[in-house]
């Protein structure tokens, strides 16, 4: 489900991986209200399974989760040739590790509490950059 194959927000899929039920609900409902297709996972293990099954266009990822943490999810996403190109937005209350998340391969970091509209705007910006990069690569 590459962003370059999808012309509108109505066909873009986001996977929200967060163990906080309230955060998952708030982010998911807002993103749905903007026309995005939203899938949810309450922990990293479930998130990894859904990433491989669904191939979302964007992943929203919390770091501190049970079973498999966000760091492990991010590492797995970046190491797989199938998922390495999926943009990952880390949304976490662990603000002192922001720089480390970029070194680990995230595309954007937002500190909790993060307004859902900011998450949406960040997702849109990442998808625009990805689409532009694909257009530039195709024109070479």
Residue ranges and their predicted role:
Residues 54-60:
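Active-site beta3 strand of CheY-like receiver
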Residues 124-140:
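The C-terminal output helix
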Residues 35-42, 50:
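Short hydrophobic/Thr-rich beta-strand motif most characteristic of the beta2 strand and flanking loop
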């Amino acid at each position: 489900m590459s962003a370059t194959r999808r012309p509108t927000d109505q066909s873009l899929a986001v996977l929200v991986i967060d163990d906080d039920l309230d955060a998952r609900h708030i982010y998911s409902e807002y993103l749905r209200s903007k026309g995005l297709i939203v899938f949810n996972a309450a922990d990293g293990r479930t998130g990894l399974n859904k990433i491989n099954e669904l191939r979302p266009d964007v992943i929203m990822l919390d770091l501190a989760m049970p079973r498999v943490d966000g760091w492990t999810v991010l590492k797995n996403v970046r190491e797989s040739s199938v998922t390495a190109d999926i943009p990952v937005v880390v949304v976490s209350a662990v603000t002192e590790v922001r720089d480390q998340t970029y070194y680990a391969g995230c595309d954007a970091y937002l500190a909790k509490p993060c307004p859902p509209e900011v998450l949406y705007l960040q997702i849109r910006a990442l998808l625009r950059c990805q689409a532009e990069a694909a257009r530039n690569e195709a024109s070479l």
